A protein has these predicted regions:
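Phosphate-binding and adjacent anionic-ligand microenvironments
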Residues: 3-13, 31-228, 235-239, 246-254, ...
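Ser/Thr/Gly-rich flexible loops in soluble cytosolic domains mediating phosphotransfer, phosphorylation
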Residues: 17-37
């Protein structure tokens, strides 16, 4: 589902999947908190390449966040476990940066009808307080900071392309960069092996997500970089996220890392 919001200047701003997911998440948790309805064992799910603004929102509301490999089926697996495994928790909301959203756990895949309903509810909810969705986004930024992300894809076709993609992934694992654009890498995660190196703590740990051919770098300034081969196309995909106090500072960080 796509979404555009009207700004104060009357122009429309088309939101990314990450911004929509964050907006719906903030609305859902805000409304549930007002009613005292956030489950004590409630959890939110998102793919590992989706915005870390969701992490900040969940931390604000004291709700557990679970990350998954890319592909909504992995979020669906968590929903299934919430129904079949005692003590696993109660699913609240899940999303991917690729415009997939789901609440409630009645379905097992991203649901545009459900997402459109939530967006309409959010409009009414904020309008009842004299606010717009644009105001709500500003409220989130004031509370959690400004976050933005970028994705770059490199098409590498044929047998040579497959070999180049495999070679790039192997190089990142064997000769791991320790900095990007002068910013130190605090943590490196290899999601295929499930191992991670926490450079800040000086010890090896486990990656947040496993079972995925991807690597992730967490930088000392809060930015992150994830690299993975596409599962459906001959592409190497690069995901970058950053956060700062202002949108201008975030864009500057992203441009530096790109």
């Amino acid at each position: 589902m796509g979404l555009a919001v009207r700004e104060k200047n009357g122009k429309f701003r088309v939101l990314t999947g990450n911004k929509i997911g964050s907006l719906l998440l903030y609305y859902i948790l805000s409304a549930m908190k007002e009613r005292g309805a956030i489950p004590a064992d409630g959890f939110v799910a998102k793919s590992i390449v989706s915005t870390r603004l969701a992490d900040a929102i969940c931390a604000h509301f004291g709700v557990k966040l679970r990350c998954t490999p890319t592909g909504f089926r992995f979020i669906s697996e968590l929903i299934e476990k919430s129904h079949t495994e005692q003590g696993f928790g109660t699913f609240i909301f899940g999303f991917e940066e690729s415009y997939g959203f789901l609440a409630g756990g009645f379905a097992r895949d991203k649901d545009a009808v459900c997402a459109a309903m939530l967006a309409a509810e959010a409009c009414v909810y904020y309008r009842s307080m004299g606010k717009t969705l644009s105001d709500a986004l500003g409220e989130i930024e004031a509370l959690c900071g400004c976050y933005n992300e970028a994705v770059k894809s490199y098409t590498l076709s044929g047998k040579e392309g497959i070999e180049r993609i495999a070679g790039a992934m192997a190089a990142l694992r064997s000769d791991t960069p320790r900095e990007f654009a002068g910013v130190a890498v605090d943590r490196f995660e290899d999601m295929r092996s499930g191992k991670a190196m926490d450079y800040a703590a000086g010890k090896e740990t486990e990656s947040e997500v496993t079972g995925m051919n991807a690597v992730r770098f967490l930088l000392s300034d809060g930015a992150w970089i994830c690299v993975r081969p596409s599962g459906t196309e001959p592409k190497l995909k690069l995901y970058i996220g950053a956060n700062a106090k202002t949108d201008e500072d975030v864009e500057a960080l992203l441009n530096k890392l790109m």
